[in-house]
């Protein structure tokens, strides 16, 4: 899997640009790549920005439901609970072990 244009992918995830995120995923960006400068995953960053649609898209494309994002030191499920994103919490609760 390619890192591709990870910075643009990460920015699109944070901005909630579902179509641009999909474009980068289709181009082979590693969905679980940790941003080298921000030390965060796109999934946790999108969750923290309250981007439920992006978070669900990332999960649909194989984002790990258990990968701890280094900067935040939390799993996607922990981040979704903190952000009160019920749809994302429900999806992650089915996929991840209890935390």
Task: Show where each model-derived region lies.
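Conserved ankyrin/ankyrin-like repeat signature
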Residues: 20, 53-54, 87-88
């Amino acid at each position: 899997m390619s890192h591709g244009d990870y910075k643009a992918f990460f920015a699109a995830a944070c901005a909630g640009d579902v179509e641009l995120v999909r474009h980068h995923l289709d181009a082979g960006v590693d969905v679980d790549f940790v941003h080298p400068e921000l030390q965060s995953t796109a999934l946790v960053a999108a969750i923290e920005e309250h981007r439920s649609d992006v978070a669900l898209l990332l999960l649909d494309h194989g984002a790990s439901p258990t990968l701890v994002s280094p900067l935040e030191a939390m799993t996607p499920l922990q981040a979704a609970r903190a952000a009160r994103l019920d749809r994302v919490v429900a999806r992650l609760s089915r996929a991840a072990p209890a935390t």
